């Protein structure tokens, strides 16, 4: 990032101009590694469009509602409502031992939406259920690290728990 334009882009600041490709590096919260690094530090970060207030998870460099590139990063609440959910019976190999499991699209209290596994049986969940995001260690959850891509090995696992 250039020091005069976006030096504080990772800390809840409004940018002075649209993000450019040179403003993004591997540590930026606008990348998946940066998003998961923040999550590992107990921060759930979303990009928030300064033109239309749309919150995007994981963060994006441009708003997918209005197309603006004027975005900032902000911490998000961990609680939300189940908008949609399904039961996965044939997951990717890293999650094979967990099947069947429930996955949901959750609208957080801020309006941002995030998809994740829910620590509840499919039949126990319903649209409108209140859940809260927790961060867990993938190995402790039974995820095979050999099935992860090399850059994903240290990423924490986000899971929603019913409240």
Describe each PLM feature range.
Residues 1-44, 150-153:
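A broadly conserved sequence feature marking short terminus-proximal activation segments
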Residues 57, 70-72:
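Short functional micro-motifs and their immediate structural scaffolds
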Residues 80-83, 118:
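Conserved hydrophobic positions within beta-strands
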Residues 49-52, 63-66:
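Short cysteine-rich clusters marking metal-coordination/redox-active sites
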């Amino acid at each position: 990032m250039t020091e005069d334009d976006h030096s504080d882009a990772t800390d809840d600041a409004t940018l002075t101009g649209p993000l450019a490709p040179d403003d993004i590096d591997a540590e930026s919260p606008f990348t998946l590694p940066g998003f998961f690094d923040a999550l590992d530090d107990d921060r759930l970060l979303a990009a928030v469009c300064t033109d239309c207030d749309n919150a995007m998870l994981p963060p994006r460099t441009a708003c997918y509602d209005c197309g603006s590139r004027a975005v900032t990063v902000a911490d998000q609440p961990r609680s939300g409502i189940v908008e949609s959910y399904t039961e996965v019976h044939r997951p990717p190999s890293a999650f094979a031992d967990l099947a069947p499991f429930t996955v949901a699209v959750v609208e957080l209290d801020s309006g941002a939406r995030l998809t994740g596994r829910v620590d509840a049986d499919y039949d126990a969940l319903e649209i409108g259920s209140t859940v809260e995001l927790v961060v867990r260690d993938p190995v402790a959850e039974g995820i095979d690290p050999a099935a992860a891509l090399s850059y994903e090995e240290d990423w924490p696992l986000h899971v929603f728990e019913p409240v």
